[in-house]
Amino acid sequence: AEKVAVTIDDNVNYVDLDDYLLGVVAGEMPANFELEALKAQVVASRTFVYNRNLSVDNTVNSQVYLSEDEMKKNWGDKYNEYHQKISEAIKETDNEVMKYQGEYISALFFSSSNGYTENVEDYFESSPLPYLRSVDSHWDLTIDPKNTRQTTFTKQELKEKFNCQDLNFNIIA
């Protein structure tokens, strides 16, 4: 089996690829998500690690990897159920990766956006990539209660939106 070099606290640990994917999916998303979501995360995570030549660290700069002990601690009595579910996602996507023009893509992912994604070069020091372009993701606003959105209005725009030309901005707290 292929091994992934995972740097944790300046120590390099060599982990079987499937075991690594199990730990990454456990660390990157809730195991109670639907199987198809877990499978998508497996494919993204597998692609990510191949893009990095099977050498990563255990931080958000790479992918968060949980050990067996950490999974047992986090999942408690759900450990066997969640372990089996993620293992199934790994098995069902065996060898599936994402490529662009024959190369592994930079499979960057996040839990949710604020209604749209970012161009890769606007967020990372990177050249533009045709597959990492900003797109609308308005559904994120409804599925993630932690999302907030800030919008700026002129005083006149607010008066028009509230249909109140007498609105006194000096008393708005």
Can you say where each PLM-predicted feature lies in the sequence?
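Conserved, single-site charged/polar hotspot
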Residues: 1-173
